[in-house]
């Protein structure tokens, strides 16, 4: 899920109704107990929390973190793969997201009626597609008749391979065994896989989860690629906000890999192959590039040997190179303006350092001050008092936060008001940050909400698994989850003013605007005036 979810809405995957009773009341009990646990941990120290956590790096390089939480007989997991759209090859954008889809298609033992025959058929599919692509993409001397013949041969090969497929077998096994919240997400920085199961299905989970990252099969690849193409059409090409965000991001990042859309460019979606996806998997889905977190009714002494038995089978490889292109300093404002039949919108973003910056907590504090709830500065000024916007906020982490990224502000215009008014009002609030100290009450509220948000985020097994996993992956230490609250607690009024003056400058700003287009003029009817 992208960090600009407030603009786009969450990415959801529809799932069939489960076939066994859900564990809603147990999960509720888990949440209640978790609040007590985390509150106590925050009030005391990390040591009390450490008693429940076991951390181990397997011989193949996989980092495993287990948190014992026995309040309900369920567990959740979070598999973090340190590869997102930033790692997409230049001419194959969208490949990280595409493989996420393929990870649900099964393995060499799940999802096939006859895998040896299917494997041979899939090889023929790739051969036919490569021949079709070579002719289709010739810069000169293309033979249109030959292209049609090769396309037909490729599609016939796909049909032949599809006869061996058992659709959705991987997900149905999980659901039949009580799986909940089965999903995955790809963003610019990483790819995540997660769901929950009853505790007595732990070994089944270990087999399933390790198998899909050991023996994935690129079955139904081109069918699923069409699903992704349609997803792009719906979320970007046919969506004014999606179009703005894509063009805004490419304007703000001209060198950094953040200028590539996670969904991928349409020409790349229409070109990359199952072989490309398999190559991406082989390079990035390796134990040293992954963190596995399990939280729930499991005992580390029993669970870790099971994890080693199954996940330890995955071959070890050297961690891939993480170097990316650094965005050079911006020296003048950039603007993107779209004319759309849509509600007018004003968006602006300012370059800021990555999440390892000493000022990361200060940026979080500014985001809280400007945007958290109906008492936030932007909501009060633009929505409540001036009544010029239907919504207004600021947030950090656009489009990701692992590398240098943007701190953004936005406002949706009320009828009769224009984006320029939003810009003026937002800049007035930014200028206050630069020239005036925030109040004692505001500073206290920033720090109080940071602690409350931590407690809230860890209330469920899945939430805790995510937070522990992402911090272990990013900092090589899950304890950073709690240290971030300590860093926010040390923010001063002077820090807010200093960072605001350093970051929120006109030359460092990229602006994105949606202006409401005039409706098409009525065409006079024949014979009329």
Region annotations inferred by a language model:
Residues 1-20, 25-29, 33:
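A cross-taxon signal for low-complexity, glycine/charged-rich
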Residues 233-235, 249-250, 319-377:
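His/Glu-based metal-binding/catalytic segments typifying zinc-dependent metallopeptidases
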Residues 67, 72-85, 94-96, 111-211, ...:
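M16 family metallopeptidases and their MPP-like homologs
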Residues 102-107, 201, 212-220, 232, ...:
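A generic secondary-structure signal for well-formed alpha-helical elements
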Residues 32-42:
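C-terminal segment of classical bacterial N-terminal signal peptides
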Residues 40-65, 291, 299-338, 351, ...:
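Proteolytic maturation boundary segments
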Residues 93-105:
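Active-site recognition of the HExxH zinc-binding catalytic motif
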Residues 218, 225-226, 233, 241, ...:
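Non-catalytic, conformational "gating/processing" segments within enzyme and secreted inhibitor domains
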């Amino acid at each position: 899920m992208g960090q600009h979810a407030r603009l786009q809405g969450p990415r959801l995957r529809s799932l069939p109704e489960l076939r066994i009773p859900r564990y809603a009341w147990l999960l509720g009990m888990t949440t209640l107990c978790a609040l007590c646990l985390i509150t106590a941990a925050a009030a005391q120290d990390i040591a009390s929390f450490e008693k429940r956590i076991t951390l181990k790096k397997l011989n193949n390089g996989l980092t495993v973190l287990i948190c014992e939480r026995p309040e309900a007989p369920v567990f959740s997991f979070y598999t973090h793969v340190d590869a997102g759209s930033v790692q997409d090859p230049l001419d194959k954008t969208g490949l990280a997201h595409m493989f996420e889809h393929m990870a649900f298609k099964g393995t060499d033992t799940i999802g096939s009626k006859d895998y040896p025959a299917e494997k041979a058929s899939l090889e023929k599919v790739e051969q036919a597609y490569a021949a079709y692509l070579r002719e289709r993409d010739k810069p000169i001397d293309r033979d249109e008749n030959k292209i049609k013949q090769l396309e037909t041969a490729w599609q016939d090969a796909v049909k032949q391979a599809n006869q061996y497929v058992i659709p959705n077998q991987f997900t149905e096994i999980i659901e039949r065994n009580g799986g909940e919240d089965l999903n995955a997400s790809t963003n610019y920085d990483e790819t995540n896989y997660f769901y929950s199961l009853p505790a007595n299905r732990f070994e089944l989970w270990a087999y399933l989860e390790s198998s899909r990252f050991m023996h994935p099969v690129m079955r139904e690849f081109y069918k699923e690629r069409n699903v992704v193409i349609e997803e792009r059409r719906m979320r970007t090409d046919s969506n004014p906000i999606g179009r703005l965000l894509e063009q805004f991001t490419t304007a703000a990042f001209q060198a950094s890999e953040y200028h590539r859309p996670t969904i991928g460019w349409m020409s790349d979606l229409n070109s990359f192959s199952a072989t490309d996806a398999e190559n991406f998997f082989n390079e990035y889905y390796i134990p040293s590039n992954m963190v596995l977190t399990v939280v729930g009714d499991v005992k580390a002494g029993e669970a870790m040997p099971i994890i080693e038995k199954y996940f330890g089978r995955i071959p070890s490889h050297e961690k891939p190179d993480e170097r990316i292109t650094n965005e050079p300093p911006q020296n003048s404002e950039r603007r993107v303006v779209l004319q759309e039949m849509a509600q007018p919108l004003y968006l602006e973003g300012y370059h800021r350092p990555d999440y390892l910056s000493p000022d990361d907590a200060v940026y979080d504090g500014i985001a809280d001050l400007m945007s958290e709830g109906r008492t936030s500065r932007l909501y009060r000024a633009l929505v409540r008092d001036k009544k010029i916007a239907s919504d207004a906020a600021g947030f950090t982490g656009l489009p990701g936060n692992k590398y240098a990224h943007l701190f953004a502000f936005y406002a949706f215009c009320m009828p009769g008001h224009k984006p320029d008014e939003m810009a003026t009002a937002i800049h007035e609030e930014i200028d206050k940050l630069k020239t005036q100290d925030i109040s004692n009450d505001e500073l206290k509220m920033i720090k109080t909400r940071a602690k409350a948000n931590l407690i809230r985020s860890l209330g469920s097994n899945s939430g805790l698994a995510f937070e522990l996993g992402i911090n272990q992956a990013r900092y090589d230490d899950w304890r950073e989850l709690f240290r971030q609250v300590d860093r926010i607690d040390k923010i001063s009024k002077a820090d807010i003013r200093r960072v605001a003056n350093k970051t929120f400058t006109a030359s460092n700003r990229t602006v994105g605007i949606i202006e409401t287009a005039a409706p098409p003029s009525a065409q006079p009817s024949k014979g009329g005036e």
